[in-house]
Amino acid sequence: MDVKWEGFSGVEMEEVKRNVFLTTLEQLKGWARSSSLWPLTFGLACCAIEMMAVGGAHYDLDRFGSFFRASPRQADVMIVSGTVTKKMAPLLRRLYDQMPEPKWVIAMGSCATAGGPYVKSYSVVKGVDQIVPVDVYIPGCPPNPAALIYGIHKLKEKIRLEAKTGKKVL
């Protein structure tokens, strides 16, 4: 797409071409959404301690534009960390349903991902993906805070790619 500019010299026109970015509104919205994720914490076990460390001074999740929210109505990402029991499942689903669209879920740790060491217990859900759709899985028992930050960055990439292609990315 060539844009005709009146009154620019050749050097000035090259400068304009290097500094003007063209995008779609959907890509711009995807970039904005991925740059300001507001997670809702659903910490249930030892993984929650590692999740709390991400908000501390050493890792400082705020510098990436993510601010922990206490209300599901203000959040767009749910971080489930720890063992989810069958009695807790309806509450988890209710919180997910209260979040506004678009919304994403991160399963942090082996307990949230597949039941962890309690997988053979009658009361443990064998993965949070049986209750809510999960976008990013973070392995580990417990995963360190750097792994959670990496998972959040992977979610940001996924959001941008979905906005760019217009298709759901698995």
UniProtKB/Swiss-Prot annotation:
GO BP annotations listed: aerobic respiration; electron transport coupled proton transport
EC number, UniProt record: 7.1.1.-
The keyword Iron belongs to this UniProt entry's keyword annotation: yes
Main location: membrane
UniProt protein name: NADH-quinone oxidoreductase subunit B
HAMAP family to which the protein is assigned, alphabetical: NDH1_NuoB
Family in the record: Belongs to the complex I 20 kDa subunit family.
Domain of life: Bacteria
Cofactors, names only: [4Fe-4S] cluster
Role this protein plays: NDH-1 shuttles electrons from NADH, via FMN and iron-sulfur (Fe-S) centers, to quinones in the respiratory chain. The immediate electron acceptor for the enzyme in this species is believed to be a menaquinone. Couples the redox reaction to proton translocation (for every two electrons transferred, four hydrogen ions are translocated across the cytoplasmic membrane), and thus conserves the redox energy in a proton gradient.
